[in-house]
């Protein structure tokens, strides 16, 4: 069996083993947020890309918790939240590409940044990504046009799959505006795609991440 096959099996096994909320309509809604798609304008817009195999467009490991914490910090009426969906299906195979995701997933994130700025020109954007979603955000943000990128005030990355390759930062984006969370024992942050239980622990960082993002827009 090839190393790639072993890693795919490990990712799939972990996805099956990870507890997922029951498939009720209410719980699925908690894993999705579509404020940008729905044309909602707030002072702050949070755009998040979930990890591989996560349900909804926000996932369940950390995305919804950051959104909730950010609303608690800034006021629920001041924050819009949007998950990256559409062409970003969070499937496993794109992790093995050179960008650790695929072009259509990167474009899905870029489209949301562009839509947020076009529809809500006064909003301040903050962003986040987990696992494959961190690669989606990394690749999208570094290539944004300057007038759109300057609207992105802060980014949080959890289990950053390109942490080693990109030196713990997003190329062509201010390092001080990025906070990377890499749990002890998460081998993904060491340049591998080997999934360990540590990779699923980033919910504990949601509050701190929200505080970091809030500090960038206050």
Swiss-Prot record:
Q: Where does it reside?
A: Secreted
Q: What is its EC number?
A: 3.1.1.74
Annotated GO CC locations: extracellular region
Tell me which residues this entry annotates as catalytic.
Answer: 131, 186, 199
Q: What is its main location?
A: secreted
Reaction it catalyzes: cutin + H2O = cutin monomers
Q: Where is this site: Transition state stabilizer?
A: 52, 132
PROSITE patterns associated with the record = CUTINASE_1 (PS00155), CUTINASE_2 (PS00931)
Among the Pfam families in the record, one is: Cutinase
What SMART domains does the database record attribute to this sequence?
Answer: Cutinase (SM01110)
Q: Where is the signal peptide?
A: 1-17
Q: Which GO terms describe its molecular function?
A: cutinase activity
Q: Name the cystine pairs.
A: 41-120, 67-81, 182-189
Q: According to its UniProt entry, what is the function of this protein?
A: Catalyzes the hydrolysis of complex carboxylic polyesters found in the cell wall of plants. Degrades cutin, a macromolecule that forms the structure of the plant cuticle.
**Similarity section:** Belongs to the cutinase family.
What is the name attached to this protein's record? Probable cutinase 3
């Amino acid at each position: 069996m090839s190393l790639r096959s072993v890693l795919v099996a490990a990712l799939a096994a972990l996805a099956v083993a990870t507890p997922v909320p029951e498939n009720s309509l209410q719980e699925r809604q908690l894993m999705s947020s579509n404020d940008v798609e729905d044309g909602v304008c707030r002072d702050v817009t949070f755009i998040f890309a979930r990890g591989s195999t996560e349900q909804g467009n926000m996932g369940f490991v950390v995305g919804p918790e950051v959104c909730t914490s950010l609303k608690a910090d800034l006021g629920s009426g001041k924050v819009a939240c949007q998950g990256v969906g559409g062409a970003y299906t969070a499937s496993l195979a794109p992790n093995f590409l050179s960008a650790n995701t695929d072009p259509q997933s990167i474009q899905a994130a870029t489209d949301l940044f562009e839509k947020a700025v076009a529809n809500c020109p006064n909003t301040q954007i903050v962003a986040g990504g987990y696992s494959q979603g961190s690669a989606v955000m990394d690749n999208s943000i570094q290539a944004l046009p300057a007038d759109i990128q300057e609207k992105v005030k802060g980014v949080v990355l959890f289990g950053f799959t390109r942490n080693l390759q990109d030196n713990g930062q997003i190329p062509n984006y201010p390092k001080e505006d990025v906070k990377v969370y890499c749990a002890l024992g998460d081998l993904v942050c060491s340049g591998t795609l080997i999934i360990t239980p540590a990779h699923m622990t980033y919910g504990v960082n949601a509050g701190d991440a929200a505080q970091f993002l809030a500090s960038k827009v206050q």
